[in-house]
Design a protein with these regions (language model features):
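Generic hydrophobic, amphipathic alpha-helix propensity
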Residues: 12-21, 37, 62-66, 70, ...
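Amphipathic alpha-helical linker/stalk segments
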Residues: 2-4, 60-91, 124
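Amphipathic alpha-helical segments used for helix-helix packing
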Residues: 87, 101-126, 179-187
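Hydrophobic alpha-helical connector segments
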Residues: 75-108, 128, 133-136, 140, ...
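Helix-turn-helix
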Residues: 15, 23-57, 61
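Amphipathic alpha-helical packing segments from all-alpha helical-bundle domains
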Residues: 71, 75, 118-152, 162-163, ...
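N-terminal intrinsically disordered/low-complexity leader segments
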Residues: 1-11, 18
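C-terminal peripheral helix-coil segments that are non-catalytic and often amphipathic
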Residues: 2, 94-97, 101, 137-157, ...
Length: 214
């Protein structure tokens, strides 16, 4: 009986987190009401507050969950010993595929970090499992060595590994972060936007790697 109660409680907490994630990602912390989350989760507000004392606690839990999904496996790919060209293609495929399934995620993350700068460290920890101080040496070390070797061989223009990563991620994330503007400016409906993103799987590796050739 106790095991059944514990499982039911766990299911309820997960249902609340699922509802909170959906609502926070669409509306942001400022635009979200606890009553809306309770209704989406199918619980009353008293039970909601039993699991999460206040909106801030629930917002932090929802943000951490969203942060884990922002760069699925990207950090591991960048830090790996794989060939540089393959890393670029893999990162692009991972990001475009994931963001196509979660198109509101970049706008939510950007908005939360802008209004709650302290969540930047939370984002890094959730995505990488590292502190901001450990991130550079652990993630960028291999990339730095690969770039330096390519530059020395005359196969690549010099670029800081930090710029390499930021430029690559920006090319993937930007169309989703400002999707309404992109669609309005280019006259795209949702179907054409999806086709546009599908083409970027081929266009981005060629563009990014071509820009680094000497």
């Amino acid at each position: 009986m106790k095991q059944l109660k514990k499982k039911k409680d766990g299911d309820t907490e997960q249902r609340i987190l699922d509802a909170a994630h959906a609502v926070f990602v669409r509306r942001g912390t400022a635009g979200t009401r606890m009553q809306e989350i309770a209704a989406a989760a199918g619980v009353n507000q008293a039970l909601l507050h039993y699991y999460f004392r206040n909106k801030e606690q629930l917002a932090r839990a929802a943000f951490e969950r969203a942060a884990r999904g922002l760069m699925p496996a990207v950090v591991q790919v960048i830090a790996s010993d794989g060939e540089l060209e393959e890393k670029v293609r893999r990162v692009i495929d991972l990001e475009l595929d994931h963001l196509s399934r979660a198109p509101y995620l970049p706008g939510y993350i950007i908005g939360e970090v802008t209004h709650h700068p302290e969540r930047a460290a939370q984002l890094i920890a959730a995505v990488t499992g590292l502190t901001p101080q450990d991130l550079g040496p652990r993630v960028l070390g291999t990339l730095r060595r690969q770039i330096e070797a390519r530059v020395k061989a005359g196969a690549m223009r010099p670029i800081a590994p930090e710029s390499f990563v930021v430029n690559l991620m920006a090319l993937c994330i930007f169309p989703f972060a400002v999707r309404p503007m992109v669609q309005a400016m280019l006259g795209m409906d949702d179907r054409r936007f999806a086709q546009f993103i599908a083409r970027r799987h081929e266009d981005l590796p060629a563009f990014f790697l071509g820009a680094l050739r000497p």
